[in-house]
Structure formats: structure tokens, C-alpha cells
Amino acid sequence: MKFKSLLVVALAAAVPALACAKKPKTPAAPAAAEAAPVVEEEEPTITEECVVNVSLFHESVKNKMYADAYEPWWDVYQHCPNANKSIYSDGAKIVEALYGATTDAAEKARLANLAIEMQDKRIKYFGNDPKYPKSYILGEKGLAYIDFFGDTKLKEARECLRQSAEGMGPASKIMVLVKLVDVSYALYKENPNTLAEQFIADYEIASSLLNEQATNSNNKNAEIAGKQKDYVDNIESVLSKPIEDV
């Protein structure tokens, strides 16, 4: 169906966003498109119900009643994920317990994905926390990849652990540093010709930070850090052997 030229021009002027099947031979220069205004996402409202549910699931977790904790925790996690950091510290315990308790493959997969998603959401709402910032949370995410996905997500785990070590420095969680070396070594064994330098770099940062922790007289975990440094040093020593002998 054809439109008269005057009608086409009128429609084009009134609704410039419409796409035309046949353009006029001498179209008017289009107006410069204005950038869409940036709309900041509103923080979820922390309702009285959320506050009550935080108290309920936290008390259940303290008593290791993880099944009872799940329902109030899930409600808070969905509706007011910015209410309290315990949503994530307690949530990790809840998800881990339920994951271990179920034999249903679909439920295990759901909980595994939830464990990772939870850390991303924690970064979104609490990534600027002075004690447990984004770098710390990335370490927790890397450990979650290992715990819930085993050797199927080693690259993702390593990336998170490496970023955590770089960001936290001497304040890094000991297990993050140890697992960084473990995971990097596992990846190296799969591709010894291409990932040797990556493994050495990961080992060096982990060993150096563990050494700082082990030699810090004010660190209550200095002895543990020293033992773990010996462990990662032993892993690094295998590079002097042929990969088939390891």
C-alpha cells in the first residue's frame, strides 16, 4: 500500500523514529540523537520483614539448623540483598549445607550456581566494605568455584583467586593463596608448554605473601602461613622434574 508523498513527509516529521520502506529523495538532515539519561538503580528497600528474617536465619545458622534458615534467608536474599553482610556469610554456609544434603542433580546444580551468583551480588552491594572489599569477595568466589564445580571451572577459579591475591596483598586469606597455587598447577599440568610462566607467576605472588604473613610477629596465623608456604614451595619444586614424573 502506497502513501502519498505529503503524508510520508508529515509522518516522518511527526514520528522521526519510524523506519520507512521508501525514503524521500532529499530527506531532511536528522536531528542529533540525545544520549539517554543515566538512571541510577534504586537500592532495595529494607523492610521490617527483612530485618526480622535476617534475625531468624542468622539465629538458625548459629545453631546449625540450615534447612530452617533457608526460607527466611532466601526471602531476604531476593527482596533486600543490601540489608546485611550476614546474607552472604551465613548464606554461604546455608548453600553449602543444603548442597551436601541433597542427592538431586538438578538441585545441586541450582545451588552451585547460586553459590557463585551470591558472591557477585555481594560485590554489588558490599564491594566497598573496608574489611571485606571486592578483592576479598573475589577470593570467596574463587573458592566457591573449586568447592562446587571441582576441576570443571579451574580457569574461572584461578582468575578470581589471582585478583584477590593482587588486591588483598598481605591481608589475603591463606586458603586463597594456597588454592591459587593448586589451581594454577592443575592448569599447568594440562598445558605444560604454555602455562609454565603463568604458574610461576602465581606461585611467586602466593609464596611471597605467605612469607610476609609467616614472618609478621603480629599475625596470629603466622605459624599456619609458614606451613602453607612450605606446601606451595614444594609444589613449585616439581617444575624441575619432567611433567610425566610428577
What residue ranges belong to the model's regions?
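Bacterial Sec-dependent N-terminal signal peptides
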Residues: 1-32, 92
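Preference for long, solvent-exposed alpha-helical segments and helix-linker "stalks"
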Residues: 24-246
